[in-house]
Amino acid sequence: MFTQRNKVFLVTVLVVAVLFSLALVTMAKEYVPGTPLKVGFIYVGPIGDLGWSNAHDKARIICEDTFPWLETVYIESVAEGSEGLYIDKLIMEEGCDVVLTTSFGFMDGTLISAQKYPDKIFAHCSGFKRNPNLMTYMADFYQIYYLNGLIAGALTKTNKTAYIGAFPIPEVKRHMGAFAVGVRETKPKAEVHVRWIYEWFSPTAAKEAAEALIADGCDVFAFTEDSPTIVQVAGEKGLPSFGHYSPMYDFSPEYVVSGQIAHWEAVYLDFLAKVYAGAYTAHNLADVDYWWLLKEKAVEMGAKPGMLINPAYEDELKEKKVNDPVLGMISVYDLVMKRLEQMSDPSMVFDPFNGPVYDRDGNLKVPEGLRMSVFELTTIDWAVDGIVGPWE
């Protein structure tokens, strides 16, 4: 027999349950096109890293400044594997309509969350798993790493260039491979020596890796790590390097030759405008994959915006010649400019992974007359000829 206290308790429980259910319905409500849009970003590193996460956050700010109907929030320094908890926070507490996760290691957690919240819109950067409410996107640098490789091959005196990688995942292996293709094109006997640091942002590990490679005789540096540490360490030794993701010229003006600069805003502005207009919904994203390159202006080659190549290196690159099968005898400087023009053309008449391309064991991976598909590029796991060092 219920006492008055039991009845009050039961009513309280029922009221709480109803309110919680209503809250869930409200949070799960599908976005209505043309209404204010709230977007949450999840970053793997700190926004002050001056690399990957910093570039994404600059793009977020550009989007918010461009669209009066857009509100954004972000969470930084999220460990890969814990993204699901933060996605819950963005949806349950912040009320986000769209969640963008910006690291390869967030892929599985993002897919699980997309299935958990089928009425919300998700976008995952650098991955390949999609869902009706989950699209993928990438502003990829492999073309620019190839161009940087052309320059590195021309500049190395020891025939040992260096690439310090964060994690041995397809994205980084693709960039290393393109860099190696470029190096071998201008210096056939040169090598790309690899060190992994197993961190996206670790100035300490980056410094140790750079110093070890310098001790091994490497004299030109490329990398995937989200700080300017490597350009600073190389510069202190008078060695050239290439900036990564954000402009790094100011950290070593004499020795940053060029680099890769991301314009994530190109992707974000296009995607969010289409969500706002109703072109993209929580039901039609399974086949949406932004694979944006030079021709879409999602990436830029340069030591800093507007400076393709540091003027201090232009004369040396103009003096050094290579014999290209199609272009004939040409300076490295002119070759870089020609390849940049070709890859920026909408028809993209040249690609770094045009065959023949061999792996470092001598196996033909891309036959002559063919080029790697987007899927092959995004899942690459083999080392291009010329790469030296551990691969996992």
Task: Pin down the residues of each PLM region.
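Juxtamembrane cytosolic interface motif at the C-terminal end of transmembrane helices
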Residues: L22-A28
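Bacterial N-terminal signal peptides that target proteins for export
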Residues: F2-V13
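A residue-level marker of the well-folded mature domains of exported/periplasmic proteins
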Residues: T3, A28-E392
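Bacterial N-terminal signal peptides
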Residues: T12-S21
